């Protein structure tokens, strides 16, 4: 998926059906590290739901747009299911490397995702460079591989404001582990860079960071 200025690009069910074969092959490759067949199945259903039109991306909202199976199984996949996320991101980064074989730069950014509620992990009234203002949103730190054609993400780290790491009454019910401590954007960026460098990807000549 080429980064186009937004977190996700939505498509209709009809458009999705036209590229189903390519999408299914892509999802199968990306979800292979999940191992168990059932886990890969619900991962595929979840990704398809995220690509459909609709502002709300909760499990319940996805169930309304893509009724396949039951909501409890979807919730199990995105919440307590104990699967390792790093092999998936490494597989994605390696695929991005193949798509952008001659990178000009790695670009660090902090995209924001506007939210209307207050229960999504990390949501707070905070500044978003994507929105260009302070708003109720989630903010992530992201690393992108870029060339003359465009860019695509190598990884993300969700930024958690202090109210999410220091208030157990808020972070606990949302599944934030007790051992997670507050980390500013810069520290998240360094951790993301170290992780990506550990995957032995080709290093670009330039590294850039968004200063907005």
Where are these regions (language model features)?
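Conserved, well-structured functional cores that handle cations and Mg-NTP chemistry
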Residues: 3-6, 10-212
